[in-house]
Structure formats: structure tokens, C-alpha cells
Amino acid sequence: MSSSPGRPAGSTSWRDGAPISHATNLPGDEHGDFGVLSMDESLTEPGDLGGTTIAVSTLLSINTIMVSAWLEEAGVDPDTVEFVEVPFPSMEQAMTDGQVDAAFTIEPLLSQALDGGAHVIGYPIADTYPGRAHAGYFATRAYVDAHPDELAAFTRATVRGNEYVMDDPDYYRELLAEHTDIPAETLAAMRLPALSTPSEQDIMEILADLTYRYGVIPEPFEGDPSELLHFAEG
């Protein structure tokens, strides 16, 4: 079982002959834990980004898909934008050095970049598909069929753990402080991401369409997106 915040694992794995199921998901919600930032004061809204360079952690990924959809909704042709692959930890420096005009980054690096002088242009996932999944944990269909009890336990633990920490953000931050090297001032300011379940079938259909539309897969997705979904009872 694995998580996928980069390439759209559902449609690409299905395309490559490896049927998988989506067990839990990370929604794009009001928290805005993924955002497009810039150091350039002339870039203040999505419509300003035509003809610019935008850093993403992985090319041909969920990141480029979501930013492209967000740009297109704002009237910007994504083909006029150059996506540049930059590791998340290097994005702030890439903006500072002028290597890129903007960056699509994630917490806690988002808050660190804001402290370093960047400003938010927008939150592509939350702005375009609020409350919809953009990452998740996946398992092969064979594993799902062979290990229903384990999958049910994993799903229960994920959901209950998430509900617990979201009800107590101070404890959530204490756990992050214990298990990560995030500076205390960043922990205090950062937006806390949340897992949720179940996932909606419509976002799987949307992502399947967008992976083809923006060139991640060479042909339209032919499978049934609902077959990518599986949520254990309990």
C-alpha cells in the first residue's frame, strides 16, 4: 500500500495494467495547504501567470494537472506556462534567485516561504475543486481482495486518527514537533492538512479526464473510475 501526492496513481497505474483501489484521500479544502506562491509583486492572481515559469515537484503530475485546470479556469492557456521541476525544499530559493516566477508548494514549506517574503497567488486545488481529493493511499486490487480485514483496520485507523488530531490541533502540532524537524515558529503558523474518507467518484472521473487533457496519459482513460474506489467497512 502506498500514498500518492505526485503522479496520478489511479489512472496511470490502471493504464499500465495494475488495477488499484483508493483507500483514503487528502482533500483540497479551505485549509489551503497547497498553494501557488511568488516573490514577484506584479503577480497577484492566476490571470497574471500567462507566460511565466512555475515550479512543481514533479512534471506530468497531479501538481501540473491541478495548476493547469486552475489556470484555465482563470482564462490562462496552460500551454503558455512553463512548468519547471524543482524539489519542494528548493522552491523558495528558486523564486528568490529568479529561476522561476512562481511555485506550487506545500506546507510546511508554504509557510516558510511566506515568512521569507513570498505571497500567495492562489490555492489551485481548494479554489478549483474544493473538498475534493488530490492525493491518497492506494492498494492493488489483489491486495484488497486478499486482505479485507487489514484494509478495514487501516481505513479505521486513518479516519479515527485524523478525526482525533483535527479536533485537537495543538496535539496535532505536538505530534509534528515530535516526529519532524519543522521549526516551532513554522509549526505554529502552518495550515494543517487533513485526510478524509470516503472519496467521491466524481473526482476520480475528473482526474481521469484531466490526466489525458493535460498530457499525462497519451489516450483517454478507458476504465471505469468507480473501479478505482474501495473503502472497507468499519
Predicted regions and their residues:
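Short helix-capping segments at alpha-helix termini
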Residues: 73-79, 216
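Conserved C-terminal helix/tail region of periplasmic/extracytoplasmic solute-binding proteins
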Residues: 212-234
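Pocket-lining segment of extracytoplasmic ligand-binding domains
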Residues: 8, 84, 89-175
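Short helix-loop capping/hinge motifs at secondary-structure junctions, enriched
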Residues: 40-48, 76-78, 142-151
